Amino acid sequence: MLFRSEAVLRWLGDPRRLQRWARNELTPREVDALARAIRSTDEFTIADVALLDELSTLLGRAPVNEAKDDEFDWMEGLSDGVNEVLTTSERRARAAAAREADEPEEYAHVLVDEAQDLSPMQWRMVTRRGPQASWTIVGDPAQSSWPDPDEARAAMDSMLSHLQRHSFRLSTNYRNSAEIYAFAGEVIRRTLPDADLPNAVRSTGVDPEHRIVDDGKVAEAAGDAAVELLQLVEGTVGVIVPPKLRPVVDPVLAELGDPRVVAVSPLESKGLEYDAVVVVEPDRIVSDTLGGVRALYVVLTRATQRLITVNSTTNWLP
């Protein structure tokens, strides 16, 4: 009988089976929560890919039907009326090549960007693709969306401990104005006082602006801020909104009818930049987004020229 990794993972939806396999690794509450989550999930997400890959590795390749290897194929590869006879060894070689085509490749060089966001299981998955490869790893712990960055870093060190390492530090920030980055630095240093932050060398003379409004007027205020910024920059205006507020804020932005206004969630903003940014409800970003203050730090560093925050409280301000 053949087992697919997807089916094996779904077996864990049975709490009794999960409890037996987990032994002392999970508490009864964790067993119930995990089993319930698996049973209630119709489709796997990107977060499950590393688990499925691990299971595929443990299960191994499907066995080959050796009976067919002993047969001769007298009619394969007809050319100019000549019958090509495939020997058993040739057939096995072709079967092995076909199997290898379905296996993860091993790469000579592996490049990992946003390395701070990889989980321990994802590091295991990636290193299987290049156990003897050279690596380029780019990351910033201050921007990690993983709940425990130290755990993820330890996993990376464990997986790549056999490799010689050369570290380089990014010392200059060219993206953000000095005014914007100074404020973002204040925010992240409340959580990571030892954060290794680069120096922003470009000044605009414009400080970030923070607007406090009534709770029911946040969406309207976000739209007003976007309109103002459209008049001040030639490029794009990013409006970064907690996912739960998108149904309220998105219609307001749609009424503006300007394609330069782009609404994204905090996690969607990673790796992006805008000429100006409106940050909606920073407190909600901290409380609702994986990574908390680190996620807010990412959001605050998306703007190259101007930054406006719109919030109903001042709790988040440094």
List each language-model region with its residue ranges.
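Conserved helicase motor core of SF1/SF2 NTP-dependent helicases
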Residues: S56, G60-P63, M75, S79-V85, ...
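Conserved helicase NTPase catalytic core signature
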Residues: M1-H109, L118-W123
